[in-house]
Design a protein with these regions (language model features):
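Membrane-interface alpha helices of multi-pass inner-membrane proteins
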Residues: 245-260, 271-272, 291-296
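Specific aromatic-rich, kink-prone transmembrane helix
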Residues: 125, 177, 217-237, 253, ...
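Transmembrane-helix motifs of polytopic, lipid-linked glycan transferases
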Residues: 162-186, 224
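Short acidic/glycine- and proline-prone juxtamembrane loop motifs at membrane-interface regions
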Residues: 115, 207-218, 259
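Start-transfer (signal-anchor) and selected internal transmembrane alpha helices
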Residues: 1-24, 41-101, 556-564
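Transmembrane-helix signature of polytopic, membrane-embedded enzymes
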Residues: 18, 88-92, 178-201, 219-220, ...
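Membrane-proximal stem/loop segments at transmembrane-domain junctions that anchor or position
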Residues: 309-462
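Extracytoplasmic catalytic/substrate-binding loops of multi-pass membrane glycan-assembly enzymes
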Residues: 108-120, 129-145, 149, 153-158, ...
Length: 565
């Protein structure tokens, strides 16, 4: 390692980039460590500094080694030809994944009816209201199979079983496609097997595969979109000359945007970015991607707003500002002026319900969501004014709600106390007008409803009942959260920092097109920072893209000659 620290090396641009990367990691690690241990990121100790410096030093050495290894191999090597995989490999990989997931499906049969599924079904089938608060494409995929099961078999449970299996099938094909394409990003077969083991055996994958949530299918489709972007960067001429590759990019971009409301704008911006980066082939890109943009805007925004009786509003992306104002009111009420207090109360009446990990108790009570949407400019002015006066409280509020995405040692037992790691128990009718469900360490959730007969709940009938307690424990008390090493290895933040490192390396070698996959992952993470809380299902796309980022980083070690042979 001595060659890393020669005088010429210390004066080089790679050293500067590596230093900037490591210092940024130092700042975020220090903030996360301080907040978790002392309640504020501004309460610093010798221990927190030592831990953060150690992480920064390791990051600096890794980054510098990566720069120098890539330079030795003549920069970022670009494959000159495809390393095609066969349909047999795709089907075999998909079958292996499905087989590995099957015990979860049989144990949880007909699937995990959790998260927002019960609400989506209530509006669609229970009272016949079009509600685009959740993506319509997922709502009608779910309710369509429920209706089919009820029509053919006289059972919503049968329909839900078909839906769950269809979701598993779609996800297994998507992941198999991603894994089979890793050979086009680097020449190490070990990456394929590592990714396959991760998808098959890491419990987050099979559990979310049998869970009725839009995040499951979105994550799989998003990983296909990202791997297509990576292939475009590595094989520009071949990729753009292949109708099949462009079609997969088109379809994955369209479906990814339709399966998550906050991802639609991200996908639109990325497609526009492609047009700018590949301006020499602007006409072809425009001809291929403009229809995708139009369809995405029509199906994801215009049509839902026109046909929906209930839609989301601007407050959906203002969870963090709401939390920052509420935290400031809670901690600085004695020094805030009466006019400012009145302004806060008029928009956030129940700010006293502040929970530093989730905004929902405030946002969905007292008419907060609608009040902010009705007078957004006033809310933003109030937010900015209090932010200038109390920046520390704003920063602490940011750390409290988002650290799971960027703090590599984040423990879900600390950051996720309002929601379980993964949901397992579904809603049950407790008594007339009341629905309830167990949420593990997060407590018991109760929901009072007026029309209990309109709430549809499939019956859970486990075909492997002995496995149910094991899966339940994996959802509520995952063993990898109890080990510092396993927590680090399975941290979504590790994927984000790896993507950031790839972006920096791309800047150094002036390969701006290679930045696109890394920027895509970073940009998705930034959309999550605006969400209501940190949840594993929101971070699931980061897990799905981990093999892609690993392949791109390992590809820096491949020699140009070997890649073109």
């Amino acid at each position: 390692m001595h060659y890393m620290f020669t005088n010429s090396s210390l004066r080089s641009r790679p050293t500067l980039y590596a230093l900037c990367f490591s210092m940024l990691l130092f700042v975020f690690t220090l903030a996360g460590y301080n907040f978790d241990n002392y309640g504020s990121c501004f309460t610093v100790s010798a221990t927190s500094i030592v831990v953060s410096l150690a992480c920064a030093c390791i990051a600096f050495c890794c980054a510098l080694f990566l720069f120098q290894k890539a330079e030795k191999n003549e920069g970022i090597a670009i494959h000159s030809s495809y390393i095609c995989f066969s349909l047999k490999s795709l089907f075999l990989s998909s079958a292996i994944i499905l087989l590995a997931w099957m015990p979860y499906y049989l144990a949880c049969f007909p699937g995990l009816y959790v998260y927002d599924a019960i609400t989506q079904v209530y509006y669609s089938l229970g009272i016949g209201v079009i509600n685009s608060f959740h993506p319509l494409v997922h709502t009608y995929w779910l309710t369509g199979f429920l209706s089919l099961g009820n029509l053919v078999f006289g059972s919503y449970t049968a329909g839900f079983a078909i839906y769950t299996f269809s979701q598993m099938l779609v996800m297994s094909i998507c992941f198999a496609y991603v894994l089979c394409n890793l050979s086009q990003l680097c020449r190490r077969r070990s990456v394929y097997f590592t990714g396959l083991i991760m998808v098959c055996l890491f419990p987050v994958f099979p559990i979310l595969a049998v869970s009725a949530t839009k995040d499951s299918a979105f994550s799989a489709l998003f990983s296909v979109f990202v791997v297509q972007l990576a292939k475009l960067c590595r094989h520009e001429e071949c990729f753009l000359g292949s109708k099949k590759e462009v079609s997969v990019l088109f379809i994955s971009a369209l479906l990814s945007g339709l399966f998550r409301n906050n991802a639609m704008i991200l996908i639109v911006l990325l497609l526009l970015m492609l047009i700018v980066v590949y301006r020499s082939k602007r006409q072809f890109i425009v001809m291929a991607l403009i229809p995708c943009l139009i369809l995405l805007l029509l199906l994801g925004s215009v049509v839902p707003k026109k046909i929906s009786q209930i839609t989301s509003n601007s407050s959906e992306i203002l969870g963090l500002p709401i939390q920052q104002i509420a935290r400031t009111m809670l901690l600085q009420s004695d020094s805030i002026s009466q006019d400012e207090k009145d302004a806060v109360v008029s928009m956030i009446p129940n700010w006293g319900l502040y929970n530093q990990r989730i905004v929902d108790p405030i946002k969905f009570s007292g008419g907060t969501s609608q009040a902010i949407a009705d007078d957004l400019p006033s809310f933003l002015r109030l937010w900015a004014k209090l932010g200038f006066e109390y920046p520390r409280d704003y920063i602490d509020a940011f750390v409290a709600q988002t650290e799971g995405y960027w703090y590599i040692f984040s423990n879900y037992d600390t950051v996720g106390t309002t929601k379980p790691y993964l949901e397992f128990d579904q809603w049950e009718v407790m008594e007339s007008g009341t629905l309830g469900r167990d949420m593990g360490q997060a407590g018991y959730d109760v929901y009072n409803v007026q029309d209990i007969e309109n709430w549809i709940i499939p019956f859970r009938h486990s075909l492997l009942p002995s496995l149910l307690p094991v899966i339940r424990k994996l959802c509520y008390d995952p063993f990898w959260m109890n080990s510092l090493f396993l927590r680090l290895v399975t941290s979504p933040a590790l994927v984000v920092w790896s993507a950031f490192l790839l972006a920096i390396v791309s800047v150094h070698f002036r390969k701006m097109d290679l930045m696109i996959p890394a920027v895509t992952i970073i940009a998705y993470t930034m959309t999550c920072l605006l969400g209501p809380c940190y949840l594993i299902r929101y971070a699931f796309p980061l897990y799905c893209c981990a093999p892609i980022i690993l392949s791109l980083l390992l590809g820096l070690f491949d020699c140009s000659e070997s890649l073109s042979s």
